Every structure is written in C-alpha cells, then in structure tokens.
Amino acid sequence: MTSSDSHRSAPSPEHGTASTIEILPVAGLPEFRPGDDLSAALAAAAPWLRDGDVVVVTSKVVSKCEGRLVPAPEDTRGRNELRRKLINDETIRVLARKGRTLIIENGLGLVQAAAGVDGSNVGRGELALLPVNPDASAAVLRIGLRAMLGVNVAVVITDTMGRAWRNGQTDVAIGAAGLAVLHNYSGAVDRYGNELVVTEIAVADEVAAATDLVKGKLTAMPVAVVRGLSPTDDGSTAQHLLRNGPDDLFWLGTTEALELGRQQAQLLRRSVRQFSDEPIAAELIETAVAEALTAPAPHHTRPVRFVWLQTPAVRTRLLDRMADKWRLDLASDALPADAIAQRVARGQILYDAPEVIIPFMVPDGAHAYPDAARASAEHTMFIVAVGAAVQALLVALAVRGLGSCWIGSTIFADDLVRAELELPADWEPLGAIAIGYAHEPTDLREPVRVADLLLRK
C-alpha cells in the first residue's frame, strides 16, 4: 500500500453535501517568482487548514513558481508576435478559429483559447505558459502541505476557459489530487424511482468554478479553500475530465468540420460489395440523384438518366437474362464451365443489394456532324458526362452513409437491357450501381500516389 492509498476513502453515494460549504480566501500570499516554494508559502498563509479541505490554486501561481514564464517584448506588436509563436508551439491541433482567436488542443489535452498562453497577472515583460503537468503539481503541493501542516487535503489547480454552447468563461480543473474528480450516478435511483442512467458530475470543475467567486481576477487572491465538502480520494486526476478522440462529439468547430467534410467527401467513396439488410429511405437516394445531376454536361444538356429498379420482379428478370447472355458469351470464348460459373457469380451483388440503379446516356441535345471523327468525339463527350454523374452519385451516396459499387455488366448487354426495360433505342446503359448500407464499417480511401500518373508539360 502506498502513502496515497492510505488516505483514500470509500466512495460516497452522493457528491453533494446537503449542508453548508464554506469558501475561504487565503490572504497574505506573496508575489510569486520562479523557484518559490508554493507549499511553504501556503502553509505559512493558511496554518488553519484542516483534514478534508480542498485547496484550490490558480494555475498562474503554479506556472510562476515552476518557471513557466517567458520573457516578452514590452511593446504591443512584439508581445503579440511572441504570443502567437508560443500559441503555435503549444498547439497539438486547431479545433476552430474565428478571426484571430484560435481554439486549440494543447499537449495536456486541454481544449481552450490560445493554448493557455496568457499575459494577465504577469509583468509587462513576460508571458505565462500553463504548468507542464498540473496533476503532478497538485500532487506535489498536497504532499508538501501534509508534510508541513500534518493535514490531509485535496488540491485542485484551475484555469479559465469558455464552454461550448454558452457565453462567458468559468474556471475549470486542469490539475487535481486527493479527490474524485467525477461522480457517476449511473444506476442510482432518485426519490421518484427513476434510474439515473448517464448522469456524471464533474466535481472538480464545480469546485473550481465555485472558488472563482472568491478568487476573482483582480483581487490578487489566487488561492481559496473549500471546506465542508469531505472529498473522496479515488486516485483520479484532472486528466480523467478530458474527453478526447472518438468520444468527443465536438472534435472540431463548425467551420472546420465543414471544411474537413468537404476534403474527405471524395475519399468516403469506395466500392462496397456486402450490404446489410437495413432499409434505405427513398429520400436519401432521391436527394443523392438530384445532386449527381449537377455534374458537368455538354451544351447545357441533360445526357443522363438514372433508372431505379424498384420492382423486385423487374430486377430479377433483367439480371437473369443478363446472366444467361453472359454464360453464352463466355462459352463462345471456350472457357471451362467452372470458370464461367465463377465469372457469372460476380454479378450476384446486383441480386443482393438493397437497391440498384442503372445509369443511361441519352443523346438529347447532341450535335450532329457529317463526319465520323466529330460524331465519335461528340458521343465520347456525352459518355464522359455520364461518367461524371455516376461518380457524383457515388460520392453523394457515400456522404449520406450509403455504400455503393459500380458494376459494368449492362454495357455488355445494351440491347437486352433496353428491351427488358422498354427503353428507347438510343439510350445506352453504362453499368449498374448497387446501393446499400455497408455490412462492415468502411474507412476513408487513401489518395493514390501521383508519381507518373500526373504528367507535366
């Protein structure tokens, strides 16, 4: 058992006290400088500390004592330039920006404006960085107070930051030792018999915010003590308050999330060959088709028609006839029966997919030319336009969470497809698109290395 283990207490079923809590200022503290002994200064200023008190310290004081002050020019321009450099140095990733304001994640995992780089309550020739490890700083301060005063206290180190959804800033815990930073009510039942399913209270943040009412910002009162809370030490730290990575539903600001979505839209599309049975809302496909039809087309024409095979019997009959034709074609190539069966089986995806759409090129509005060369070029131009619309449809489906796979089979049976679907003779089928929710989650595609695929002249 470690020394810290011996001071841990059993968890309480309730984080609130239902009784009086006091918040006491710690007066008489000096102006701290690098190398100062914070524990000794607090012990001298607050010899009245008791077991169970929570000592709440503004992070700026800790930064000063730990030498996290950076010399800065006193002129506004130079000071601001250094501040921007320090913010960049402390930044792990940018979540959002508005004007010159940056909301970032720093090396501690904290998400806040300006990475915690601060020019308040320090000399004009300095800027302050956050403590390197606020949880460790809290633990050291707790041990120091125990050694000097013989008391078992909890310690919370705070910083000021804004909140999503709400105006204004509040103090939160960025370092903690000696108290349960979270209190989970999951499974508890209120007096009406309702189970509290997801309620988890950020106790350390509540303590931090409460003491700011005493500490303030201009009072030169960087430390306050909460008395009457009787905290439970479960070994947790302020790091347990951070929600990072996939658990964070607000990982980016709105503008940045939209930008990332635009950048990733193309990479979301990949060929999905196994689908779940989940039904697809018709509006999703209709909206995706509407977007796909904005693809570029020659002469302001509409050279694309999408035929949605919604009637099961129509789809099955068409696919059966295409499979028969495919077998005959392969047999005429003298392929063995097992090879033919294997090739034909690739078309099973069009039977199994929840939805199938066939894209057609229609030559409405195509220019007529007397020579074969220009007529062929005009035809190619219309084919390319359909290809653009097909790709646009696949991407539009992907951004709605729908998987798809383009299959070229109808191109090899154009007359048969037109006859089965009773379509005009100049409509050219250009494959088929299987659509559905992917059976397994899919990742973003990796961009292809350009290398010799992009030529420069």
From Swiss-Prot:
Superkingdom to which the source organism belongs: Bacteria
Reported cofactor(s): Mg(2+); Mn(2+); K(+)
InterPro entries with a match to the protein in the record: F420-0_g-glutamyl_ligase, F420-0_gamma-glut_ligase-dom, F420_FbiB_C, FbiB, Nitroreductase, Nitroreductase-like
EC number from the UniProt entry: 6.3.2.31, 6.3.2.34, 1.3.8.17
Pathway: Cofactor biosynthesis; coenzyme F420 biosynthesis
Residues the entry annotates as binding coenzyme F420-(gamma-Glu)n: D329
Gene3D superfamilies named in the record: CofE-like (3.30.1330.100), CofE-like domain (3.90.1660.10), NADH Oxidase (3.40.109.10)
Chain ranges passing through the membrane: none
Record: residues binding FMN: R269, R270, S271, V272, R273, A297, G408, R445
Gene Ontology terms: biological process: F420-0 metabolic process
Region: Dehydro-coenzyme F420-0 reductase, residue numbers: 254-457
Binding site for GTP: L29, P30, E31, F32, S59, K64, N121
Paired cysteines (S-S): none
Nucleotidyltransferase keyword on record: no
Residue numbers binding a divalent metal cation 1: D118, D159
CDD domains: FbiB_C-like (cd20607)
An annotated Gene Ontology molecular function: coenzyme F420-0:L-glutamate ligase activity
Function comment: Bifunctional enzyme that catalyzes the GTP-dependent successive addition of multiple gamma-linked L-glutamates to the L-lactyl phosphodiester of 7,8-didemethyl-8-hydroxy-5-deazariboflavin (F420-0) to form polyglutamated F420 derivatives, and the FMNH2-dependent reduction of dehydro-F420-0 to form F420-0.
Protein name: Bifunctional F420 biosynthesis protein FbiB
Protein's organism: Mycobacterium leprae (strain TN)
